[in-house]
């Protein structure tokens, strides 16, 4: 901005704000204590530095000049922050004039802006760093933040709107909200959307943009919770990759690594694309080893299913790398296979996943010599192949001859073990059948003895006909009791006798 005094007596001014011309006279001094002081001390040139430091747009300065001349001005969420700042630094307050711009701006802020969530966010999201600095100096940043925090705690879904704010406002807002018992789902969603908007966008190559992105990814790591499963594994891997690319601090990178290792079993093979080859065709093997080491050394011992999930994921990643990367070198494939085998050892019953990856790799690299093929198959454990995989491998012409011979040997061993198990089963079934025959013989012998015993009872009790089953009440006895054939004395007896009754004939 350029200021030109027309003459020392009139003190009329010609101002240029970012190339836009403004003509002012002493009317401005009547509304601004600062300008009055500068005029009296003949230091009007300092006004240029005041306005430049606030990065005032010509439209805002035009609004101020209109107020100084007594015209009506239109305040809005778009201009209220800048108007507040310029009114404060030009000392357009009650101390200088009863009808002042600062009082008018503060009233509008309280009644029209802070009462509305959307208007408050809108007022802040368009502020430059210089304006925010001035706003912080006068203590108005806290006023805006307190208003937003109060509303966000009542409805955490509003956190999605905050991603439009500058980082210096967004981070303290999320940190303060996270101290309360709020929905982690909405909080995490807001942080992830912020990263997608400000960090993961394609870099234009500008140094300042890269610096802002680096600060952004470091803030994202600080804001994300550590609870297992609250953040998708895909986002964590993507954030880790971006933190490495942007050269973020070690604490930032370590934070993402820890979160990934805590829920590695929830990741998918495609999430491991962070290991995708760089320009030189190499994979970040050490990073993968670091994450796996952290996962397996976790103090909270996971159940076996988590180990199984990680082992299968690594096998699937190895398969995808073999299928999609035509430039995958033998040495790199071998290192990835070694990691996958180490993860599946004593966890998976079969190593069919490793075999499938090797088969695909050999298919895509037909030009490999025999020694290179053997190198690719170095960590293939033929003894852990399923019978189906052995059958396929025994006919696989892509495999080295030595591997095929090992597979054939394993197949023979599997057949022998199968026959042995079947023979053992036959012997066990035969023994069971013998036991059943002996049991049946004992039952038949018992049945042969029972008739003699029953005959003896019939001889002793000629008058009683007993038809009974073992451990069951005589049906005939029940019939007699119901029809009054049993006296109290005969009820106590172990068997009852049928008393002969006289037959009476009635003659008419």
Swiss-Prot record:
SMART domains registered for this protein in UniProt = BTB (SM00225)
Q: Name one GO biological process term.
A: protein ubiquitination
Positions of transmembrane segments: none
Pathway assigned to this chain's UniProt record: Protein modification; protein ubiquitination
Q: Which residues form the BTB domain?
A: 11-77
The PTM Phosphotyrosine maps to: 355
Keywords, A to Z, come to:
Phosphoprotein, Ubl conjugation pathway
As recorded in UniProt, coiled-coil segments are none
Pfam families linked to this entry? BTB, NPH3
Q: Does the keyword Phosphoprotein apply?
A: yes
- Its job: May act as a substrate-specific adapter of an E3 ubiquitin-protein ligase complex (CUL3-RBX1-BTB) which mediates the ubiquitination and subsequent proteasomal degradation of target proteins.
The free-text domain remark for this protein reads: The BTB/POZ domain mediates the interaction with some component of ubiquitin ligase complexes.
Stated family = Belongs to the NPH3 family.
What name does the UniProt record give this protein? BTB/POZ domain-containing protein At3g03510
């Amino acid at each position: 901005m350029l200021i030109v005094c027309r003459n020392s007596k009139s003190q009329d001014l010609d101002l240029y704000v970012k190339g836009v011309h403004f003509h002012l006279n002493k009317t401005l001094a009547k509304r601004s204590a600062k300008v009055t002081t500068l005029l009296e001390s003949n230091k009007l040139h300092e006004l240029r530095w005041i306005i430049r430091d606030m990065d005032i747009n010509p439209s805002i300065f035009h609004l101020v000049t209109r107020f100084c001349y007594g015209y009506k001005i239109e305040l809005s969420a778009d201009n209220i922050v800048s108007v507040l700042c310029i009114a404060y630094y030009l000392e357009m307050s009650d101390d200088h004039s009863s009808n002042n711009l600062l009082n008018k701006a503060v009233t509008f802020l309280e009644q029209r802006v802070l009462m509305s969530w959307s208007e408050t966010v809108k007022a802040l999201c368009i502020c430059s760093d210089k304006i925010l600095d001035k706003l912080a100096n006068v203590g108005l940043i806290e006023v805006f933040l307190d208003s937003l925090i109060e509303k966000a705690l009542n409805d955490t879904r509003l956190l999605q709107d905050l991603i439009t704010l500058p980082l210096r406002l967004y981070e303290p807002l999320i940190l303060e909200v996270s101290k309360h018992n709020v929905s982690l789902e909405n909080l995490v969603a807001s942080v992830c959307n912020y990263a997608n908007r400000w960090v993961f966008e394609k870099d234009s190559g500008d140094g300042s943009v890269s610096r802002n992105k680096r600060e952004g990814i470091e803030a994202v790591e600080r804001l994300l919770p550590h609870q297992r499963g609250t953040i998708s594994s895909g986002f964590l891997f993507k954030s880790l990759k971006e933190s490495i690319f942007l050269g973020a601090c070690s604490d930032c990178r370590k934070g993402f690594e820890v979160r990934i290792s805590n829920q590695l079993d929830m990741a998918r093979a495609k999430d491991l694309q962070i290991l995708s080859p760089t320009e030189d065709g190499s994979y970040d093997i050490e990073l993968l080893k670091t994450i796996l080491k952290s996962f397996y050394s976790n103090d909270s011992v996971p159940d076996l299913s988590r180990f199984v999930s990680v082992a299968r994921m690594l096998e699937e990643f190895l398969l995808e790398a073999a299928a999609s990367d035509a430039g995958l070198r033998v040495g790199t494939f071998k290192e990835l296979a070694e990691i996958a085998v180490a993860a599946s050892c004593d966890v998976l019953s079969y190593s069919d996943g490793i075999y499938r990856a090797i088969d695909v790799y050999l298919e895509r690299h037909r030009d490999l010599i025999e020694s290179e093929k053997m190198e690719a198959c170095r960590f293939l454990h033929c003894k852990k192949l399923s019978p189906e995989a052995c059958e396929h491998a025994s006919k696989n012409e892509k495999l080295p001859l030595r591997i095929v011979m090992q597979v054939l040997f394993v197949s023979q061993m599997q057949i022998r073990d199968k026959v042995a198990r079947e023979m053992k089963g036959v012997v066990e079934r035969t023994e069971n059948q013998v036991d059943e025959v002996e049991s049946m013989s004992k039952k038949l012998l018992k049945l042969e003895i029972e008739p003699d015993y029953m005959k003896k009872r019939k001889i002793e009790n000629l008058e009683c006909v007993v038809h009974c089953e073992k451990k069951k009440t005589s049906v005939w006895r029940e019939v007699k009791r119901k029809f009054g054939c049993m006296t109290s004395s005969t009820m106590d007896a172990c068997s009852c006798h049928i008393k002969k009754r006289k037959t009476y004939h009635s003659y008419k």
